């Protein structure tokens, strides 16, 4: 498919490709695009790094495109420490989950907003959980957070398990990995003041993402474990 010229983009990942070129994965409103960047060791190559808002002209109709023009479209988002690791985590999620050339403008907008919030030092966990949930929902993998798989409203004192690609199922026998109704209802309202809601949201998103990641671990998660 042909793509509009001069569209906004962010670099998700870049690696050397043949002599003096790079193979770059971009996030654009038109989806994830892969393109060859010529003269990657020149000025263009200095721009082809994560978290820099770009305007890129893509050429070619095949799945592997060429970068015709690339310019800065704003100030690079500067992050360090766990905020930087979080940005790398978002990039890896998008590379792994977002189909090539499948337009998701809402994902692009939320990604840009999340980078800005990370750079401003906002609390990491709520930002990451929100991004994970919105990404799943936009890709069609979302599920109701205030009702079970039978359409019944969640009970505050109920216990639930996630049936991936179906939703939340109420259970009446204790077992590992369950979620409290109060925690789930807090998640649905993004009310992180409820005790246990954030840690439960992390467990829930990991379960929801796992099936779509194909059993391969995310490399960026290991960064958070290093001293």
Swiss-Prot record:
Q: Which InterPro entries match?
A: ARFGAP/RecO, DNA_rep/recomb_RecO_N, NA-bd_OB-fold, RecO, RecO_C
Q: Which NCBIfam families match?
A: reco (TIGR00613)
Q: Does the keyword DNA damage apply?
A: yes
What name goes with this protein?
DNA repair protein RecO
**Gene that specifies this protein:** recO
- UniProt family annotation: Belongs to the RecO family.
Annotated membrane-spanning segments are none
For whether the record's keyword set contains Ligase, the answer is: no
Functional note: Involved in DNA repair and RecF pathway recombination.
Keyword annotations of the record:
DNA damage, DNA recombination, DNA repair
Q: Which GO terms describe its cellular component?
A: bacterial nucleoid
GO BP field:
DNA recombination; double-strand break repair
Q: Which domain of life does this protein belong to? A: Bacteria
**Which Pfam families does this UniProt record tie to the protein?**
RecO_C, RecO_N
């Amino acid at each position: 498919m042909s793509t509009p010229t001069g569209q906004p983009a962010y670099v998700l990942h870049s690696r050397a490709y043949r002599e003096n070129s790079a193979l770059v994965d971009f996030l654009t409103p038109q989806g994830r695009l892969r393109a060859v960047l010529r003269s990657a060791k020149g000025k263009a190559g200095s721009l082809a790094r994560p978290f820099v808002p770009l305007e890129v002209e893509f050429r070619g109709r095949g799945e592997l495109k060429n970068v015709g023009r690339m310019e800065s479209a704003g100030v690079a988002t500067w992050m360090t420490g766990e905020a930087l690791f979080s940005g790398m985590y978002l990039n890896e999620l998008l590379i792994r989950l977002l189909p090539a050339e499948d337009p998701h403008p809402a994902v692009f907008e939320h990604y840009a907003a999340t980078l800005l919030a990370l750079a401003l030092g906002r609390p990491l966990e709520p930002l990451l959980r929100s991004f994970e949930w919105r990404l799943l929902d936009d890709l069609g993998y979302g599920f109701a957070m205030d009702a079970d798989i039978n359409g019944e409203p969640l009970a505050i004192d109920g216990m639930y398990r996630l049936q991936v690609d179906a939703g939340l199922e109420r259970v009446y026998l204790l077992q590992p990995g369950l979620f409290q109704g109060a925690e789930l209802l807090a998640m649905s309202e993004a009310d992180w003041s409820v005790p246990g809601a954030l840690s439960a949201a992390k467990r829930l998103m990991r379960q929801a993402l796992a099936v779509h990641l194909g059993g391969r671990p995310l490399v960026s998660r290991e960064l958070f474990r290093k001293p």
